[in-house]
């Protein structure tokens, strides 16, 4: 049926998910059968754990998932990162300086143990406000409005830009 030395990776949005942002019962059944028979399957997405986890509940994923465009490798069963590849503090500071020069307000993500801390200075443009409103109650993501985005050396830095 399939090659047992091949890893299959699917995106979520626009690929695995329906237009309603769900994994269909048919897709879940087919994938779970293939996974039970030895298929190496996982997903890669720009989403964070708090956004991806509810969408993947129907799947019996045995492999870690790739989150935040490859920044985080995450174990869905243990609900914890396996690997994090943060931005170096100097690079994060340089990126924030560029955003500030161009009057762009990004979300600045820091990983504090298993919690994603999302700092921001304002909820403009409208896309930033919508992003915040749709995710502000996520269990493993905490939003904090700050006067100034500051990079610290004690927590991995992850930048995300929601700006349309």
Predicted regions: what is each one?
Residues 3-4, 37:
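Short loop/turn elements that form and flank the Walker-type P-loop nucleotide-binding site
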Residues 25-133:
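Active-site phosphate-binding/coordination module
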Residues 4-6, 61:
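Short loop/turn microsegments at loop-to-beta-strand junctions
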Residues 162-164:
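Conserved small/polar residues in nucleotide/adenosyl-binding loops
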Residues 22:
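Residue-level recognition of oxygen-bearing side chains
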Residues 6-19:
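Asp-based phosphoryl-transfer active-site loop
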Residues 124-149:
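Acidic, His- and aromatic-enriched active-site or binding-groove loops in soluble protein domains
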